[in-house]
């Protein structure tokens, strides 16, 4: 099943039901839908394993950049301790446009004209799209148990002004909408430590110079130090490539 229905950040439906039905029948799934993976990550992986199927979700984070297929095998034997990421191409594009003097509304209009932003861009601008991606990453790489949107401290970019963005550039850095998480502390009462918020970062930070709709993520590990992945974070062709890559992977392993 190639599942790419519209993301529902509250329930994951209808995609969640489609994925459950396919996996329950032993059918592998490739999806670009963030909602079901973020909200029911462990349930769906267990369902896939129980029925001899595979669940692939490369296209849920960083569009066509091969993040999970590269970092997953690449970190075998290492512990990922934390990550920081710019995970929303729409927001990064708008911040870059505001840096050159565009108003917030003008930057949004341009992003919509270019096809980067939806007609109803609230999930992007309010940080919920990034929060879902951070949840997927935390469960994939940091050993998080099931998490909900209520576990994420979220602040979007609606409060940003061109003045704040340009001031950051004058200070030698940049403002970015940063998703971050740390490996959870031990103990049953340990609260997930995931946040999404605009932050000032210095020019030497790997995410400071991301252009346009680019996305990037910096993993900190116990053995290899910092490892950075960057690539296009928005676009239909890029997401379609991620789905195709997953389908080819599933097909190859099914032979």
Where are these regions (language model features)?
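Rossmann-fold NAD(P)-binding glycine/threonine-rich loop
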Residues: 7-25, 32-72
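Rossmann-like NAD(P)H-binding beta-loop-alpha module
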Residues: 49-119, 124-129, 136
């Amino acid at each position: 099943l190639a599942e790419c229905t519209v993301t529902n950040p509250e329930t994951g439906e209808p995609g969640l039901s489609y994925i459950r039905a396919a996996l329950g029948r032993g059918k592998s799934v490739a999806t670009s839908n963030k909602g079901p993976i973020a909200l029911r990550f462990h349930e769906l992986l267990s369902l896939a394993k129980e029925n001899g199927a595979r669940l692939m979700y490369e296209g849920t984070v960083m569009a066509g950049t091969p993040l999970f297929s590269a970092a997953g095998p690449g970190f075998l034997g290492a512990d990922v301790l934390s990550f920081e990421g710019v995970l929303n191409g729409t927001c990064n594009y708008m911040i870059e446009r505001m840096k050159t003097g565009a108003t917030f509304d003008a930057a949004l209009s341009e992003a919509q004209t270019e096809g980067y932003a939806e007609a109803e861009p609230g999930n992007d601008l309010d940080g919920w799209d990034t929060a879902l991606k951070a949840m997927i990453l935390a469960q994939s790489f940091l050993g998080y148990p099931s998490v909900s949107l209520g576990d994420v401290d979220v602040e979007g970019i609606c409060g940003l002004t061109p003045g704040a963005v340009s001031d950051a550039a004058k200070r030698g850095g940049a403002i970015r909408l940063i998703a971050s998480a740390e490996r959870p502390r031990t103990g049953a009462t340990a609260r997930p430590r995931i946040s999404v918020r605009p932050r000032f970062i210095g020019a030497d930070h790997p995410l400071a110079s991301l252009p346009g709709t680019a996305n990037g993520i910096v993993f900190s590990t116990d053995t290899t130090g910092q490892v950075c992945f960057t690539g296009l974070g928005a676009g239909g062709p890029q997401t379609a490539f991620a789905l195709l890559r997953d389908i080819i992977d599933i097909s190859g392993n099914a032979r």
